[in-house]
Protein backbone atom coordinates (compact mmCIF):
# COMPACT_ATOMS: atom_id res chain seq x y z
CA UNK A 1 0.00 0.00 0.00
CA UNK A 2 1.27 3.49 -0.82
CA UNK A 3 2.47 5.46 2.20
CA UNK A 4 0.09 8.24 1.21
CA UNK A 5 -3.01 5.99 1.27
CA UNK A 6 -3.49 5.90 5.11
CA UNK A 7 -3.27 9.68 5.14
CA UNK A 8 -5.86 9.94 2.36
CA UNK A 9 -8.24 7.61 4.18
CA UNK A 10 -7.87 9.59 7.40
CA UNK A 11 -8.48 12.84 5.54
CA UNK A 12 -11.63 11.40 3.96
CA UNK A 13 -12.92 10.28 7.35
CA UNK A 14 -12.25 13.71 8.81
CA UNK A 15 -14.08 15.39 5.92
CA UNK A 16 -17.08 13.13 6.44
CA UNK A 17 -17.16 13.91 10.16
CA UNK A 18 -17.15 17.63 9.44
CA UNK A 19 -20.38 17.23 7.52
CA UNK A 20 -22.09 16.56 10.85
CA UNK A 21 -21.09 19.86 12.41
CA UNK A 22 -24.28 21.85 13.03
CA UNK A 23 -25.06 24.77 10.75
CA UNK A 24 -26.94 27.82 12.05
CA UNK A 25 -30.09 27.26 14.09
CA UNK A 26 -33.05 26.09 12.07
CA UNK A 27 -31.05 24.12 9.50
CA UNK A 28 -30.64 20.34 9.67
CA UNK A 29 -27.27 18.82 10.42
CA UNK A 30 -25.90 16.84 7.46
CA UNK A 31 -25.48 13.19 8.33
CA UNK A 32 -27.74 13.57 11.38
CA UNK A 33 -31.13 14.16 9.82
CA UNK A 34 -32.51 10.68 10.53
CA UNK A 35 -34.80 10.57 13.57
CA UNK A 36 -33.48 8.94 16.71
CA UNK A 37 -35.55 7.21 19.36
CA UNK A 38 -36.91 9.82 21.74
CA UNK A 39 -35.82 9.47 25.34
CA UNK A 40 -38.53 8.81 27.90
CA UNK A 41 -37.45 11.55 30.26
CA UNK A 42 -39.25 14.90 30.22
CA UNK A 43 -36.09 16.59 31.51
CA UNK A 44 -34.10 18.40 28.83
CA UNK A 45 -30.79 17.66 30.52
CA UNK A 46 -31.43 13.89 30.25
CA UNK A 47 -31.77 14.02 26.46
CA UNK A 48 -29.25 14.17 23.66
CA UNK A 49 -29.54 17.07 21.26
CA UNK A 50 -31.00 14.78 18.60
CA UNK A 51 -33.59 13.39 21.01
CA UNK A 52 -34.56 16.93 21.89
CA UNK A 53 -34.74 17.94 18.24
CA UNK A 54 -37.02 15.03 17.42
CA UNK A 55 -39.21 15.60 20.47
CA UNK A 56 -39.85 19.18 19.35
CA UNK A 57 -40.57 18.00 15.80
CA UNK A 58 -43.02 15.47 17.23
CA UNK A 59 -45.00 18.18 19.01
CA UNK A 60 -43.32 18.72 22.37
CA UNK A 61 -43.20 22.47 21.87
CA UNK A 62 -43.89 23.60 25.44
CA UNK A 63 -40.86 24.24 27.64
CA UNK A 64 -41.13 24.61 31.39
CA UNK A 65 -38.48 26.70 33.13
CA UNK A 66 -38.54 25.71 36.83
CA UNK A 67 -37.37 28.46 39.18
CA UNK A 68 -36.27 27.52 42.67
CA UNK A 69 -33.87 29.28 45.00
CA UNK A 70 -31.15 28.30 47.44
CA UNK A 71 -32.19 29.46 50.89
CA UNK A 72 -32.62 28.54 54.52
CA UNK A 73 -35.83 26.77 55.50
CA UNK A 74 -35.52 26.35 59.22
CA UNK A 75 -33.63 23.70 61.21
CA UNK A 76 -35.12 20.65 59.48
CA UNK A 77 -35.37 21.41 55.72
CA UNK A 78 -32.37 21.46 53.38
CA UNK A 79 -31.19 24.57 51.54
CA UNK A 80 -32.14 23.13 48.14
CA UNK A 81 -35.81 22.57 48.99
CA UNK A 82 -37.18 24.89 46.31
CA UNK A 83 -34.90 23.48 43.62
CA UNK A 84 -35.76 19.85 44.29
CA UNK A 85 -39.45 20.57 44.66
CA UNK A 86 -39.92 22.66 41.54
CA UNK A 87 -37.94 20.20 39.40
CA UNK A 88 -40.01 17.24 40.58
CA UNK A 89 -43.33 19.06 40.30
CA UNK A 90 -42.44 20.43 36.86
CA UNK A 91 -41.75 16.87 35.75
CA UNK A 92 -45.17 15.76 36.95
CA UNK A 93 -46.80 18.71 35.21
CA UNK A 94 -44.93 18.01 31.95
CA UNK A 95 -46.02 14.38 32.02
CA UNK A 96 -49.65 15.41 32.50
CA UNK A 97 -49.48 17.93 29.67
CA UNK A 98 -47.92 15.41 27.30
CA UNK A 99 -46.42 18.14 25.10
CA UNK A 100 -43.85 19.63 27.46
CA UNK A 101 -40.21 19.27 28.43
CA UNK A 102 -38.50 20.67 31.51
CA UNK A 103 -35.40 22.87 31.40
CA UNK A 104 -32.76 22.72 34.17
CA UNK A 105 -33.72 24.46 37.40
CA UNK A 106 -32.80 28.10 37.95
CA UNK A 107 -31.33 27.78 41.44
CA UNK A 108 -30.02 31.33 41.92
CA UNK A 109 -32.62 33.99 42.67
CA UNK A 110 -32.87 37.28 44.59
CA UNK A 111 -32.83 36.45 48.31
CA UNK A 112 -31.95 39.80 49.84
CA UNK A 113 -28.94 42.08 50.08
CA UNK A 114 -25.43 41.11 51.15
CA UNK A 115 -24.24 44.38 52.70
CA UNK A 116 -25.83 44.34 55.14
CA UNK A 117 -27.34 40.86 54.91
CA UNK A 118 -31.13 41.01 54.77
CA UNK A 119 -34.03 38.55 54.60
CA UNK A 120 -32.85 34.95 54.17
CA UNK A 121 -29.26 36.15 53.62
CA UNK A 122 -28.99 36.42 57.40
CA UNK A 123 -28.79 32.61 57.47
CA UNK A 124 -25.68 30.69 56.28
CA UNK A 125 -26.07 28.88 52.97
CA UNK A 126 -28.56 31.21 51.34
CA UNK A 127 -27.36 32.43 47.92
CA UNK A 128 -28.57 35.61 46.25
CA UNK A 129 -28.24 37.39 42.90
CA UNK A 130 -29.30 40.94 41.98
CA UNK A 131 -32.75 41.29 40.39
CA UNK A 132 -31.23 42.49 37.11
CA UNK A 133 -29.08 39.35 36.88
CA UNK A 134 -32.11 37.18 37.64
CA UNK A 135 -34.15 38.92 34.94
CA UNK A 136 -31.37 38.64 32.35
CA UNK A 137 -30.80 34.96 33.15
CA UNK A 138 -34.45 34.05 32.70
CA UNK A 139 -34.63 36.06 29.49
CA UNK A 140 -31.60 34.30 28.03
CA UNK A 141 -32.90 30.84 28.96
CA UNK A 142 -36.29 31.56 27.42
CA UNK A 143 -34.67 32.97 24.28
CA UNK A 144 -32.50 29.86 23.93
CA UNK A 145 -35.56 27.63 24.12
CA UNK A 146 -37.39 29.83 21.63
CA UNK A 147 -34.73 29.50 18.95
CA UNK A 148 -34.73 25.71 19.45
CA UNK A 149 -38.37 25.55 18.40
CA UNK A 150 -40.40 25.81 21.60
CA UNK A 151 -43.55 27.84 21.05
CA UNK A 152 -44.89 27.99 24.61
CA UNK A 153 -42.48 28.81 27.42
CA UNK A 154 -43.72 28.46 30.99
CA UNK A 155 -42.06 29.95 34.06
CA UNK A 156 -42.92 28.04 37.26
CA UNK A 157 -41.60 29.61 40.45
CA UNK A 158 -41.58 27.79 43.80
CA UNK A 159 -40.64 30.83 45.88
CA UNK A 160 -43.01 33.66 46.73
CA UNK A 161 -40.49 36.50 46.59
CA UNK A 162 -40.12 36.77 42.82
CA UNK A 163 -43.64 35.95 41.59
CA UNK A 164 -44.45 39.51 40.48
CA UNK A 165 -41.05 39.93 38.84
CA UNK A 166 -41.51 36.79 36.75
CA UNK A 167 -45.04 37.83 35.76
CA UNK A 168 -43.74 41.19 34.53
CA UNK A 169 -40.97 39.46 32.58
CA UNK A 170 -43.47 37.13 30.89
CA UNK A 171 -45.56 40.14 29.85
CA UNK A 172 -42.52 41.88 28.41
CA UNK A 173 -41.36 38.82 26.46
CA UNK A 174 -44.84 38.27 25.06
CA UNK A 175 -44.80 41.79 23.65
CA UNK A 176 -41.39 41.12 22.11
CA UNK A 177 -41.96 37.63 20.68
CA UNK A 178 -45.66 37.48 19.79
CA UNK A 179 -47.23 35.89 17.88
CA UNK A 180 -44.62 33.19 17.27
CA UNK A 181 -43.88 32.40 20.90
CA UNK A 182 -46.11 32.55 23.98
CA UNK A 183 -44.62 33.06 27.46
CA UNK A 184 -46.63 32.08 30.53
CA UNK A 185 -46.12 32.61 34.25
CA UNK A 186 -49.24 30.96 35.66
CA UNK A 187 -49.89 32.21 39.22
CA UNK A 188 -51.89 29.04 39.87
CA UNK A 189 -48.69 27.09 40.61
CA UNK A 190 -47.71 29.16 43.62
CA UNK A 191 -51.29 29.85 44.67
CA UNK A 192 -51.99 26.12 44.81
CA UNK A 193 -48.81 25.41 46.76
CA UNK A 194 -49.61 28.05 49.33
CA UNK A 195 -53.22 29.25 49.55
CA UNK A 196 -54.83 26.20 47.94
CA UNK A 197 -52.90 23.66 50.00
CA UNK A 198 -53.43 25.69 53.17
CA UNK A 199 -57.19 25.56 52.65
CA UNK A 200 -57.04 21.77 52.24
CA UNK A 201 -55.14 21.46 55.51
CA UNK A 202 -57.45 23.80 57.39
CA UNK A 203 -60.43 21.72 56.27
CA UNK A 204 -58.70 18.74 57.90
CA UNK A 205 -58.36 20.49 61.23
CA UNK A 206 -54.84 21.89 61.04
CA UNK A 207 -54.38 25.32 62.59
CA UNK A 208 -53.09 28.43 60.85
CA UNK A 209 -50.34 28.75 63.45
CA UNK A 210 -49.11 25.29 62.40
CA UNK A 211 -49.24 25.82 58.64
CA UNK A 212 -46.92 28.82 58.59
CA UNK A 213 -45.65 30.93 55.73
CA UNK A 214 -42.17 29.41 55.61
CA UNK A 215 -40.80 26.09 56.91
CA UNK A 216 -43.96 25.28 58.83
CA UNK A 217 -46.26 22.27 58.52
CA UNK A 218 -47.33 23.14 54.97
CA UNK A 219 -43.81 23.65 53.62
CA UNK A 220 -42.44 20.59 55.40
CA UNK A 221 -45.25 18.29 54.28
CA UNK A 222 -44.76 19.26 50.63
CA UNK A 223 -41.04 18.61 50.92
CA UNK A 224 -41.60 15.19 52.53
CA UNK A 225 -43.96 14.22 49.70
CA UNK A 226 -41.46 15.16 47.01
CA UNK A 227 -38.43 13.57 48.68
CA UNK A 228 -38.13 12.57 52.36
CA UNK A 229 -34.40 13.28 52.16
CA UNK A 230 -35.21 17.00 51.97
CA UNK A 231 -36.29 16.93 55.62
CA UNK A 232 -34.33 15.98 58.73
CA UNK A 233 -37.28 14.09 60.19
CA UNK A 234 -35.39 13.22 63.37
CA UNK A 235 -35.18 16.92 64.23
CA UNK A 236 -38.93 17.48 64.00
CA UNK A 237 -39.39 15.91 67.43
CA UNK A 238 -35.94 16.36 68.93
CA UNK A 239 -35.62 18.11 72.27
CA UNK A 240 -34.10 21.55 72.19
CA UNK A 241 -34.83 22.27 68.49
CA UNK A 242 -36.66 25.57 68.16
CA UNK A 243 -39.03 26.24 65.28
CA UNK A 244 -39.34 30.00 65.50
CA UNK A 245 -38.50 33.12 63.49
CA UNK A 246 -35.00 33.34 64.92
CA UNK A 247 -34.32 29.88 63.50
CA UNK A 248 -35.93 30.46 60.09
CA UNK A 249 -39.50 29.20 60.67
CA UNK A 250 -42.11 31.87 60.02
CA UNK A 251 -45.48 31.64 61.78
CA UNK A 252 -45.70 27.84 61.76
CA UNK A 253 -44.91 24.55 63.45
CA UNK A 254 -43.70 21.64 61.27
CA UNK A 255 -43.89 18.89 63.89
CA UNK A 256 -47.10 17.29 62.59
CA UNK A 257 -45.97 17.34 58.94
CA UNK A 258 -46.26 14.10 56.95
CA UNK A 259 -45.66 12.97 53.39
CA UNK A 260 -49.31 11.89 53.18
CA UNK A 261 -50.42 15.46 53.82
CA UNK A 262 -47.88 16.71 51.33
CA UNK A 263 -49.29 14.49 48.60
CA UNK A 264 -52.59 16.35 48.92
CA UNK A 265 -50.68 19.51 48.09
CA UNK A 266 -48.81 17.89 45.23
CA UNK A 267 -52.06 16.78 43.62
CA UNK A 268 -53.53 20.26 44.02
CA UNK A 269 -50.48 21.95 42.47
CA UNK A 270 -50.29 19.61 39.49
CA UNK A 271 -54.03 19.72 38.79
CA UNK A 272 -54.36 23.50 39.01
CA UNK A 273 -51.19 24.23 37.04
CA UNK A 274 -51.95 21.82 34.21
CA UNK A 275 -55.45 23.26 33.86
CA UNK A 276 -54.08 26.81 33.83
CA UNK A 277 -51.48 26.08 31.14
CA UNK A 278 -53.99 24.27 28.94
CA UNK A 279 -56.50 27.10 29.27
CA UNK A 280 -53.93 29.72 28.25
CA UNK A 281 -52.62 27.63 25.35
CA UNK A 282 -56.12 27.52 23.89
CA UNK A 283 -56.53 31.30 23.85
Functional labels for PLM-detected ranges:
Residues 4, 21-22, 33, 64:
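Selective for proline/serine-rich intrinsically disordered segments
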Residues 1-11:
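Bacterial N-terminal signal peptides that target proteins for export
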Residues 10-24:
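Bacterial N-terminal signal peptides
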Residues 28-154, 158-283:
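Extended, histidine- and acidic-residue-enriched regions that form the cofactor-binding/catalytic faces
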Residues 8, 22-23, 30, 191:
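Compositionally biased, low-structure terminal segments
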Residues 1, 18-19, 30, 61:
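Residue-level detector of alpha-helical hydrophobic segments embedded in or interacting with membranes
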Amino acid sequence: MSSSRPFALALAALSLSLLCVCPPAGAACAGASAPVAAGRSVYLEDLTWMELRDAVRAGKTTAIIPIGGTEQSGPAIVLGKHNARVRWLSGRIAQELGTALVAPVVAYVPEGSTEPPSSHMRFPGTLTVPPAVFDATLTSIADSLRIHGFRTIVFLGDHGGYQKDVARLAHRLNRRWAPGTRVLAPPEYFQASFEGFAQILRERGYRADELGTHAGLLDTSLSLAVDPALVRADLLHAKGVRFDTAHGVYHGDPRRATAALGRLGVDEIVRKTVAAIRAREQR
